[in-house]
């Protein structure tokens, strides 16, 4: 796992491995840091489920669900709580982007409708 991190292997398989290792050793901060690096990379690459805001929000939701299980198993693990804060912060940022995109879409639709009405008159 550490070799993968040093080689900057940021893929879904590595993400799955970090989850397994985190369950075995929730206080191993390096695993959580690597997990954040993987998620950052996947979000920035924007492929597959990471290509849309809705997909990214779904990933965040799944990450939070995984973290609930981790917190229940190890409620005093600082590393888990730190990752949870990071995940929530990222989720809020993405949610703001999603809301802004939806508002922009509605404004564009309204402007298009007004243009059609104006052209018809």
Task: Give the positions of each predicted feature.
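Generic preference for flexible, low-structure residues
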Residues: 45-47, 94-96, 115
């Amino acid at each position: 796992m550490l070799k993968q991190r040093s080689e900057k292997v940021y893929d879904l398989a590595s993400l799955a491995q970090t989850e397994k290792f985190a369950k075995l050793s929730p206080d191993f901060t390096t695993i959580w840091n690597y997990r954040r690096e993987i998620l950052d990379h996947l979000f920035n690459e924007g492929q597959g489920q990471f290509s849309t805001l809705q997909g990214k929000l779904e990933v965040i939701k799944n990450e939070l669900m995984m973290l609930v299980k981790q917190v229940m198993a190890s409620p005093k693990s600082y590393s888990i709580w730190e990752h949870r804060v990071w995940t929530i912060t990222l989720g809020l940022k993405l949610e703001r982007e999603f809301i802004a995109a939806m508002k922009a879409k509605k404004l564009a639709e309204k402007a298009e409708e007004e243009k059609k009405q104006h052209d018809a008159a």
